[in-house]
Amino acid sequence: MSFLKKSLFLVLFLGLVSSSICEEEKRETEEEENEDEIEEESEEKKREDPERPPGFTPFRVY
């Protein structure tokens, strides 16, 4: 009987550990995806509106 209890506790413990590892990996991939999205948004903003010195206009005024 004690052998069954020990093996049951071992199985439950290993299941808990593996599920926590899976959750960590899932969180890491979600964070990486969010970082990639933020980088893409910042690159799009740079393409749309490049930084210019104050008072500079792309048009010539005579």
From Swiss-Prot:
Say yes or no: keyword Signal present: yes
GO process terms (BP)? defense response
Q: Which family does it belong to?
A: Belongs to the frog skin active peptide (FSAP) family. Bradykinin-related peptide subfamily.
Prodomain residues: 20-48
Q: Name one GO cellular component term.
A: extracellular region
Recorded protein name is Phyllokinin-1
Give the UniProt keywords, A-Z.
Answer: Amphibian defense peptide, Bradykinin receptor impairing toxin, G-protein coupled receptor impairing toxin, Secreted, Signal, Sulfation, Toxin
> Where is the organism placed in the taxonomic lineage, from the top?
Eukaryota, Metazoa, Chordata, Craniata, Vertebrata
Biased composition of type Acidic residues is found at: 30-42
Q: Which residues form the signal peptide?
A: 1-19
Record has Nuclease as a keyword? no
Give the subcellular location. Secreted
Sites of Sulfotyrosine modification: 62
Question: Which superkingdom does the taxonomy of this entry point to?
Answer: Eukaryota
The record's tissue-specificity note reads:
Expressed by the skin glands.
Gene that this polypeptide is encoded by: pp-H1
Q: What disulfide bonds does the UniProt entry report for this chain? A: none
